[in-house]
């Protein structure tokens, strides 16, 4: 999620990899170089301020949106275990500039979800998460029954994204919201 004040979460450490301190990272970013190119990064444990750490190396796991990275001074599996659920952040002033109609996928989180019925907007839920293993899916929590549904993030189903006004309009195929 984008914090307008300072930080953008670009990854989440999910587990260890091997015995030498490498960690697996679920990418929340379209920019793979954030996990491949050595340099300074920021880690954040829940409810604590971010701390600087150096990325030594990284590689993408084949067929996944998961990366394995090596961080400076993290040299054992035990130490790597302590980083589970830490967020990897970048400063918002380091976010690449986008074209007028573009947005960062993480900006979709917490947007209201509307359908258009008989020329009337009907708010049905909100975006609570993204899944992007192979294709981008919006995880939407429906207000009427508190169920979570997965909506493919494609133009045919999500024709309108209005970041400025905090909503999207979806056009789901029949039955998709009832699954």
Curated annotation (Swiss-Prot):
Keywords: Chaperone, Cytoplasm, Ribosome biogenesis, rRNA processing. It is found in: Cytoplasm. The PRC barrel domain binds ribosomal protein uS19. Belongs to the RimM family. PANTHER family: RIBOSOME MATURATION FACTOR RIMM. Binds ribosomal protein uS19. One of its GO terms (molecular function) is ribosome binding. The gene is rimM. This is Ribosome maturation factor RimM. NCBIfam families: 16S_RimM (TIGR02273). GO terms for cellular component: cytoplasm; ribosome.
